[in-house]
Amino acid sequence: MLDMNRIRKEPREVERLLANKGCIVNFDETLALDAKKRALATEGDALKAKRNQLSAQVPRMKKNGEDTTALFEEVRQIGDQIKALDDEAEAIGKQITDFVAGLPNLPDPDVLPGGKENNKVLHQWGEKPVFDFEPKDHVQLAESLHLVDYPRGAKLGGSGKWVYTGDGARLEWALINYFIDTHLKDGWQFMLVPHILNYEAGYCAGQFPKFEDSVFWVGEREGRRDQIILPTAETALVNLHRGEILSEDELPKKYFAYTPCYRQEAGSYRSEERGMIRGNQFNKVEMV
């Protein structure tokens, strides 16, 4: 998540960098909320100090036989004011956090602004082949070789689904095993993770709240969507040590996992290309 201190100090610069990634924001409202939150905290601290001063008078008053009823009532009222301020500050803090958590990371200064149309070729290797025939894309090849059945996949599960058939299924499985064997030889630890994860897993992976509508939800807790079918094994792997403190001699941790990935993909590319990555379900070996 972006550093709120930097947003306070350089709001226009952070806006400019985000705009380079196509994310247009204005931090004026966020900064106003942040200032209000800090003002509420200052007011609350002053009231807490006053409450402590009043509470410190109680032993002396009781020792002198003085009536403490009015004092206790004043302390109670101050406590109510503090709670109201804390509740308001917490609500504002959540509003700020939810907004900032949905923003992308700032790009490296060397990254060119804009989309893929502004990409700059830095290096090329080899020569681009020239065919004396019209080459087929991977979808056409998969269909002509009967490796993938798109119509029956759509019949079984709707758009964004497909069926690997015959040699296509064997090839898919062979590739998965190839990557598993390769990573094991390189010293990575193989993990099989749950396919159903809680909200915190998506949030701590940096995928929520921005991509909340891109996953499949399967459960609720206290009236809020809570459980998801994992969109990638990364979501689980980066949360394995969530809330833990690892000693230096335990590092590095090198994990990988194979899982199907489930996503509610959307966008123009879905209508332009029937790929085998940007569907609702696809296989992936993920390294973390």
Regions of interest found by a model, annotated:
Residues Q124-V288:
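TRNA-recognition modules of translation machinery and tRNA-sensing kinases, especially anticodon-binding
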Residues M1-P129, L147:
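N-terminal alpha-helical targeting/anchoring segments
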